[in-house]
Curated annotation (Swiss-Prot):
The lineage of its organism: Bacteria, Pseudomonadati, Pseudomonadota, Gammaproteobacteria, Alteromonadales. InterPro entries: YciB. Pfam families: IspA. The chain crosses the membrane at residues 22-42, 50-70, 72-92, 118-138, 148-168. This is Inner membrane-spanning protein YciB. GO terms for cellular component: plasma membrane. It is a multi-pass membrane protein. Keywords: Cell inner membrane, Cell membrane, Membrane, Transmembrane, Transmembrane helix. It comes from Shewanella denitrificans (strain OS217 / ATCC BAA-1090 / DSM 15013). Plays a role in cell envelope biogenesis, maintenance of cell envelope integrity and membrane homeostasis. The gene is yciB. Its main location: membrane.
Length: 181
């Protein structure tokens, strides 16, 4: 259910955009993200920092989009969020406190150098997606950008996740059997 909840604002944004326009879709995105945060809080009793950052960015850039009736703000939101994620990953790695290791290290045992590579890989991935978003958002029609945001970036993120998981599993430390002798 939590994974479906992560996609709820995106699905609502896309649907409302197709039915109405970018400005109504932006308002719907703000509302859907607020509902997402409320559900996460009441059902799981916890809201992750990533969700809070996303909510803040959606609210700020969505409000600017609506106030100035300029879709450039909502387009920039994607790149700014990805940039913030890349910076957070880079800083966490520089401080030897990998965010990715903190998230997955209990389930997957791997050497610190593997976690460092995966962390840097994700930071570069987010930078690449941010740059790609700027290109698509400001060089191609709005319809193309919306499709790219919803389907392209989602597919790229899923592919990156699969690649990362395979890489970690390939280099994971074997489970130690405490029952042997």
């Amino acid at each position: 259910m939590k994974q479906l909840l992560d996609f709820l604002p995106l699905i609502i944004f896309f649907t409302v955009y197709k039915l109405v326009d970018i400005y109504t879709a932006t308002g719907a995105l703000i509302a859907a993200t607020a509902v997402q945060i409320a559900i996460l809080y009441f059902v799981y009793k916890k809201v992750e920092k990533m969700h809070l950052v996303t909510f803040a960015m959606v609210t700020v850039f969505g409000t600017l989009t609506l106030a100035f009736h300029d879709d450039a703000f909502i387009k920039w939101k994607v790149t700014i969020i990805y940039s913030l994620f890349a910076i957070a990953l880079a800083v966490s790695q520089i401080m030897n406190k990998s965010i990715i290791k903190a998230m997955l290290g209990k389930e997957l045992k791997a050497d610190d150098n593997i976690w460092a590579r995966v962390t840097w890989y994700w930071a570069l991935f987010f930078i690449g997606c941010g740059v790609l978003n700027v290109y698509v958002a400001f060089s191609l029609p709005l319809e193309t950008w919306v499709n790219f945001k919803v389907f392209g970036l989602t597919a790229l993120t899923l592919l990156n996740t699969v690649i990362s998981v395979f890489y970690i599993y390939k280099h994971a430390q074997p489970e130690q059997d405490d029952t042997a002798n």
